[in-house]
UniProtKB/Swiss-Prot annotation:
It comes from Caenorhabditis elegans. GO terms for biological process: sensory perception of chemical stimulus. Its main location: membrane. The lineage of its organism: Eukaryota, Metazoa, Ecdysozoa, Nematoda, Chromadorea. It is a multi-pass membrane protein. Belongs to the nematode receptor-like protein srg family. GO terms for molecular function: transmembrane signaling receptor activity. This is Serpentine receptor class gamma-10.
Length: 324
């Protein structure tokens, strides 16, 4: 008889089925409303990122700007993750009537759940590295004013390649381990069983989160100090992209701080842990939802190009092909 939780057999092997019974949902309407709300803002984030990527790659002036190329790499990963969450991850958590219908298909090893779970953790690793490089990009634009363009023409391609490769250092463990589903409320979510106990996925993420936390704060402070020493016309030109980067940095550092807390302090502060468990998914969602909104709101020229707006005002705007 199935239980309402996953039970690992004493001599568990990779191919063993891991069945469970779905929990009863006391409020199906609320669960469906939660899915509707979360899927709505995830779709908005994905659509806005698609519009930004399309605009950047169809405008030479944007492609010449290293920041926009770094952002597009981050946006492409965000589009994939938002889409995967809407059509897979959140569906089976919140559309609870699907649990008894769909869960038996995933009691045995599934390539679908493995791809989803690996991509989810890849995106976490990718986000930390992309935020480091975007923050570094803004710092060099302010600190190394005359050398910024030349520097990024030389390092942009290697940086993009590194950004896509480094997160593989996290997901190799998932690819070799058993990925399974477990009850989550009245639905189910995806988890994994360690194949290498000495290389816990949280520890692998911890290295990236800690590195991101330290470097982003350093770049953030250096950028602010640099802006205070620039002429007003330069500060006006850089303010939009710098503010966007700062918003993204705060989001990423907040998420990294929560993950660091879970590794080191969660066992000692159960009350705080329960609160953070409720908000951590929202913080994760914000990484790929608020960023495109902030970029479109703050970049006047990009907003005009995306929505085909005609500017009849005479005030000076920030053009994308100028990184200075």
């Amino acid at each position: 008889m199935n239980s309402s939780r996953v039970v690992f057999p004493a001599n568990f092997s990779y191919e063993d089925p891991l069945p469970f019974e779905c929990n009863e949902d006391p409020n199906v309407v609320l669960s469906l409303a939660m899915y509707g709300m979360q899927s709505s803002y995830l779709i908005v984030g994905a659509v806005l990122n698609v519009m930004i990527v399309y605009t950047v790659f169809h405008g030479n002036s944007y492609r010449d700007n290293s920041f926009y190329m770094l952002y597009c790499a981050d946006a492409i990963v965000g589009i994939y993750i938002n889409t995967a969450e809407v059509i897979f991850g959140r569906i089976f958590i919140y559309i609870t009537p699907l649990c008894p219908i769909a869960s038996p298909y995933f009691f045995t090893p599934s390539i679908l759940t493995k791809m989803y779970y690996a991509a989810l953790h890849y995106s976490l690793g990718f986000k930390t590295f992309s935020q480091i490089f975007m923050s570094f990009n803004r710092m060099t634009c302010v600190i190394f004013l005359m050398k910024h363009l030349k520097l990024w023409k030389q390092i942009l391609k290697p940086v993009l390649i590194i950004t896509f490769i480094l997160p593989l250092g996290v997901i190799w463990k998932i690819l070799l381990s058993r990925v399974y589903i477990n009850p989550n409320g009245a639905g189910f979510s995806v988890n994994y069983k360690d194949y290498f106990p000495w290389a816990n996925i949280s520890i692998l993420h911890l290295f990236h989160f800690t590195l991101c936390f330290v470097l982003v704060i350093i770049f953030f402070v250096a950028t602010i100090l640099g802006l205070t020493m620039l002429k007003q016309r330069i500060k006006s030109a850089e303010r939009s992209l710098t503010i966007v980067t700062m918003i993204m940095a705060v989001q990423t550092v907040t998420f990294a701080s929560i993950q660091i807390y879970f590794v080191f302090f969660a066992a000692y502060t159960p009350k705080i842990r329960s609160v953070l468990l409720q908000i951590v998914s929202f913080v994760f969602d914000s990484l790929y939802v608020f960023s495109p909104i902030a970029l479109i709101v703050m970049s006047r020229q990009l907003r005009k190009d995306i929505f085909n707006l005609k500017d009849k005002e005479t005030q000076i705007s920030m053009y994308p092909n100028s990184e200075l």
